[in-house]
Amino acid sequence: MGREVFDSFAGFDDFLVYLALSLVLLALFIAIYIRITPYREFALIREGNIAASFSLSGALLGFIVPLASAVQHSVSVVDMAIWGVIALAVQIAAFVAAKLLIPSITRDIPAGNGAQGFFLGTLSLGVGLLSAACMSF
């Protein structure tokens, strides 16, 4: 019984490495994303702006889902990091695409337009799901 318990922790160091790198990539994504948007998501969310909450939540999930896929399918930590950065770039591209499709979106989300926030969040999540599926190599 003692050996079985010990063997269960055999991959714990890998778990910690992948988790730490995932959290670093998530923090990097948040830092970059909130800087490329012309509004202050966290301040807006604290004020109760549902549009900002929808858009940021969708972007976070749209990044986390492919990042989880990268963790699951990568052959090494470096491979996972590369695919994590690709997932980050895809989410930034999704935001830029939304801005091109609906130029007023960067004004309407801070104004509390829930429909626009929901659209951006859904677009981000959808692109993230597609990215995750494409990473299942």
Label each residue range with its predicted role.
Residues 16-20, 80-85, 118-119:
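Hydrophobic alpha-helical transmembrane segments
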Residues 59-71, 122-137:
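Hydrophobic alpha-helical transmembrane segments in multi-pass integral membrane proteins
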Residues 1-12:
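Short, strongly hydrophobic alpha-helical membrane anchors
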Residues 68-96:
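Short alpha-helical packing/oligomerization segments
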Residues 88-97, 121-130:
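Mid-bilayer segments of alpha-helical transmembrane spans in multi-pass integral membrane proteins
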Residues 104-124:
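Interfacial loop-to-transmembrane junctions
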Residues 30-44, 94-108:
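C-terminal ends of transmembrane helices
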